[in-house]
From Swiss-Prot:
The keyword Zinc does not apply. One of its GO terms (biological process) is translation. It holds the Pfam family Ribosomal_L19. This is Large ribosomal subunit protein bL19. This protein is located at the 30S-50S ribosomal subunit interface and may play a role in the structure and function of the aminoacyl-tRNA binding site. GO terms for molecular function: structural constituent of ribosome. InterPro entries: Ribosomal_bL19 (IPR001857), Ribosomal_bL19_CS (IPR018257), Ribosomal_bL19_sf (IPR038657), Translation_prot_SH3-like_sf (IPR008991). The keyword Ribosomal protein applies. PROSITE patterns: RIBOSOMAL_L19. Keywords: Ribonucleoprotein, Ribosomal protein. Belongs to the bacterial ribosomal protein bL19 family.
């Protein structure tokens, strides 16, 4: 086995739930401030997933005080405590950049019906 691939497999996290673009997720980040450590939750919709080995990322968008906030998270980051999938969304695209131009109720994502 290639040495680089072996090291990448050791660095990958196996506790990541399956989610896709359009899903509503809560990302629990570990924040270190001086000697203290706390958990900060970022709750929003996944608008983009870039798959790969250890360099996989996903982008989460939320509206905070009327301003759109997007944050890019490395999938296998040691600072991510856990990822919760709150609701699955029904979308037809993998990159939801069009949500940036929508406001209010138009920017909502329909929930996925599971029967």
């Amino acid at each position: 086995m290639n040495i680089i691939k072996k090291i990448e497999l050791e660095q990958m996290r196996l506790d990541i739930p399956k989610f896709k673009s359009g899903d509503s997720v809560k990302v629990h980040m570990r924040i270190v401030e001086g000697e203290k450590e706390r958990i900060q939750v970022f709750h929003g919709n996944v608008i983009r997933i870039s798959r790969g080995t250890t360099n996989a990322t996903f982008t989460v968008r939320k509206i905070s005080n009327g301003v759109g906030v997007e944050r890019v998270f490395p999938m296998h980051s040691p600072f991510i405590d856990r990822i919760e999938v709150v609701q699955q969304g029904r979308v037809r695209r993998s990159r939801l950049y069009y949500l940036r131009n929508l406001k209010g109720k138009a920017a909502r994502i329909k929930p996925l019906k599971t029967w």
